[in-house]
Amino acid sequence: MKRIKTSEDLQELHKRALEKKKERFVSISSGTCGQARGSQKIVDAFEKEAKGKIDIKITGCHGFCEAEPNIILFPEGIFYQHLKPEDVEGIVENTIILGKIIDKHLYKDPESGKPYIYQQDIPFYKVQKRHLLGNNPFIDPTNIDDYLAMDGYLSLAKALKISQDEIIENIKNAGLRGRGGAGFPTGKKWEMARKQAVSCQPSAVSYIICNADEGDPGAYMDRSLLEGNPHSVIEGMIIGAYAIGANEGWIYVRNEYPLAVKNVSIAIEQARELGFLGKDILGSGFDFDIRIARGAGAFVCGEETALIQSIEGKRGSPKQRPPYPVEKGLFGKPTNINNVETWANISQIIDKGAEWFSSIGTGTSKGTKIFSLVGKVKNTGLVEVPMGMTLREVIFDVGGGIPDGKKFKAVQTGGPSGGCIPEKLLDLPVDYDSLTKVGSIMGSGGMIVMDENTCMVDVAKYFLTFLQDESCGKCLSCRKGIQKMLEIVTDITEGKGKEEDLETLKDLAYVVKDTSLCGLGQTAPNPVL
């Protein structure tokens, strides 16, 4: 690949990528979820049966995980689901060559039986606003040309022509909040990091980190973004580094995400070869590069200071704050940390403007949010909806409701740190403030649906077991407190509980909450409170 040195070079590269773009192709969903359901066999079958007849694009997750393995035939948008390798020959002969729809491969409404031919008409997709996930079916994550054809890196070129302060002001005006759980305003965080970088000597090193340590049970939003559209995250990081004044970046991703690691590694190398990473990016004089750090999968390493310890080669355990990472972070240098989804939003804000982004969502929760909708729901998968959509709309309109005629009982949001929201609150808007008011959190985006047969005490026991295993053990209150709470809850599930156990459990929960150092311990009692 020829290294591009100017915005004009990028425009020419973008033009060539558009010329290569095929209007007619089959998009095969091949993220981790698809591969677990046999998508590679579908890929092999298409390469055998359809070679020379249609362009084959192996992509990240299409979102509708319940329908895996699935494909989309473009430009029509024909959606076929639950495919087997032996189905491919018929699809090539009938649909690709003759234009005939094969009814048995279509998605059918679980209640009415109505078949849907086109992806955009399926209720699971129709209700969503897929600003981040919508590009996945069009992008082979190992081919940078696909990203360039979707206006990739044009936002970077635009950002490099304006001042760092102007970029930060755009992010602030957009109202973007961190998508990793805490919901801290991203623009404010960048502003603090920028001031810290400016106050240091010009030669001083500062860092940015992409936190891809996604540890909540049932959550896989970040994994799917990295697998399906890694360049969107990389572009956001480059823009952020330029705005803040950082010159080195890290993507911290757990080693149990091998496909994400593979696709991000390829994307970084391609970006480096073309000049989006390295020295003098697009002739701007700005130098920046990204490295990957693989985590061992410890849940506590999602906490910023523990993550930093892990990158430094130390045991991943939280440190007391202040100083905060923005002041003294990685290797003792100023460090700004955002999660995968936050970084992926940056290029869209630069491209479409702060006003466009802030027009989506609610007063204090702007933009869209990706959720992994799992559990006792008909349409499991990745959903991207505007902030402020109600739980009822997400679970019943997008998710299709509860299977087997069962009744809805509760939905757990925010992972182990979150809470369970009962049926009476189904019309609650899904935004940061509304979820916090009812004792839960947005978290990174996990959403576990439970039906009438789910025992809530068993749910509490499950999360306490998880948290006991994942606690770093540094704080006595967390280490022993979670253990004791789990013992009490276990006794209750085994019929050995006593009435006074409930008061003991409540008192113990508040001690753990109030005396633990990091977010894991501070929110560990949530499953029982």
Model-assigned labels for residue ranges:
Residues G77-N173, L277, A306, S310, ...:
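Fe-S ferredoxin-like electron-transfer domains
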Residues S30-G38, I171-A193, G297-Q309, G313, ...:
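Conserved phosphate/anionic-ligand binding catalytic regions in large, soluble enzymes, centered on
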Residues V127-Q128, V261-M387, G399:
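Hydrophobic alpha-helical positions that pack around
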Residues L156-Q196, S358-S359, T364, S372, ...:
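Accessory "access/gating" subregions that flank catalytic or transport cores
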Residues N229-A243:
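Histidine-anchored nucleotide/phosphate-binding helix
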Residues G236-G240, G388-P403:
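Short amphipathic, charge-patterned alpha-helical segments
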Residues K2-R24, S39-G60, P75-K104, L154-N170, ...:
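Ferredoxin-type iron-sulfur electron-transfer modules in oxidoreductases and energy-metabolism complexes
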Residues Q196-V205:
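Short, basic, low-complexity termini and linkers enriched in Ser/Thr/Gly/Pro
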